[in-house]
């Protein structure tokens, strides 16, 4: 059976609720005007911190704000950093630093300093004994300018100390590593195709990436740095450290005639003659010699 629903207009509903809303608003206004606070406010005041609690008020006027930027007038980020300074009249540069100043002190040792002196790598001051207190790092750079870009072709010369993989003694290794950096005034954006040239591009007569880079396609994307025209210098110490890290090998030897360690007692055969261990005649396939018979 169908029962019709009564229809009430919005105006009628508001008229019915208006007396109730008026009573609640008057009660709230009276509570606010009364001198006696509500019970919940009194409870909140009782739980407040006591007056004898130790507090410190910070005076913001006595705090010096931190500088937003580093002073551009500094000669270099740190002492011994390799920093290229823009100069249109200079085409060749020489830098002298040390492994310690470049953050590679773990690769420096008295053996590396002695080998560097033998190779004629000298840089910095000498100590009281006439020896170098740090391992020198010499960097030579040739500058080529081309269409708002600077190409730095250089060589890093130093000596690092590695562990001999035969006897585990210090093994100084001379480093002569070439590097190339490309400094561009425009932001460096890596191509999405990573230099891939498709056959249809050649058929359409499009310019290849090699022609677009004008002979700089041999420089890796990680070696291309943004050097705005307004900047006067750029720090390339990170790339020098990376070049030295790439020269670390696992097959370094202290001497081509190194005898290594005894496989039985572990004695260094280069410095001891008391090892009496006899070499064992190991026949690798002797247990399997009769398998195919």
From Swiss-Prot:
Pfam families: YceD
An example Gene Ontology biological process: ribosome biogenesis
Record's subcellular location: Plastid, Chloroplast
Protein name: Large ribosomal RNA subunit accumulation protein YCED homolog 1, chloroplastic
Keywords per UniProt: Chloroplast, Plastid, Ribosome biogenesis, Transit peptide
Keyword Transit peptide carried by entry: yes
Expression (tissue specificity): Highly expressed in shoots and leaves. Detected in roots, embryos and endosperm.
UniProt similarity note: Belongs to the DUF177 domain family.
Role this protein plays: Plays a role in synthesis, processing and/or stability of 23S rRNA. Required for embryogenesis. May be involved in RPL23 transcript levels regulation in non-photosynthetic plastids.
One Gene Ontology term, aspect cellular component: chloroplast
Knockout-associated phenotype: Embryonic lethality when homozygous in non-permissive genetic background (cv. Wisconsin 22) or albino seedlings in permissive background (cv. B73).
Residue range covered by the transit peptide: 1-42
Domain of life: Eukaryota
């Amino acid at each position: 059976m169908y029962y019709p629903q009564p229809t009430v207009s919005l105006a009628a509903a508001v008229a019915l609720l208006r007396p109730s809303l008026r009573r609640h608003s008057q009660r709230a206004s009276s509570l606010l005007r009364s001198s006696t606070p509500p019970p919940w406010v009194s409870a909140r005041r009782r739980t407040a911190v006591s007056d004898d609690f130790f507090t410190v008020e910070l005076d913001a006027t006595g705090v010096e704000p931190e500088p937003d930027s580093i002073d551009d007038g500094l000669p270099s980020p740190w002492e011994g950093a390799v920093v290229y300074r823009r100069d249109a009249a200079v085409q060749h540069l020489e830098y002298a630093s040390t492994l310690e100043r470049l953050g590679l002190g773990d690769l420096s040792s008295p053996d590396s300093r002695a080998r560097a002196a033998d190779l004629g790598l000298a840089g910095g001051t000498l100590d009281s004994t006439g020896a170098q207190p740090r391992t020198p790092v010499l960097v030579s750079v040739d500058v080529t300018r081309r269409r708002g870009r600077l190409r730095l072709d250089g060589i890093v010369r130093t000596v690092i100390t590695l562990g001999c993989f035969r006897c585990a003694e210090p093994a100084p290794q001379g480093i002569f590593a070439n590097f190339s950096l490309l400094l561009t005034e425009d932001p460096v954006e890596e191509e999405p195709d990573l230099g891939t040239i498709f056959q249809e591009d050649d058929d359409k007569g499009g310019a290849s990436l090699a022609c677009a880079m004008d002979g700089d396609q041999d420089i890796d994307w990680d070696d291309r740095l943004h050097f705005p025209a307004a900047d006067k210098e750029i720090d390339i110490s990170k790339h020098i450290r990376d070049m030295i890290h790439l020269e670390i090998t696992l097959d370094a030897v202290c001497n081509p005639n190194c005898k290594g360690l005894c496989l039985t007692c572990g004695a260094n055969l280069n410095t001891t003659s008391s090892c009496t261990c006899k070499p064992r005649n190991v026949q690798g396939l002797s247990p399997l010699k009769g398998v195919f018979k």
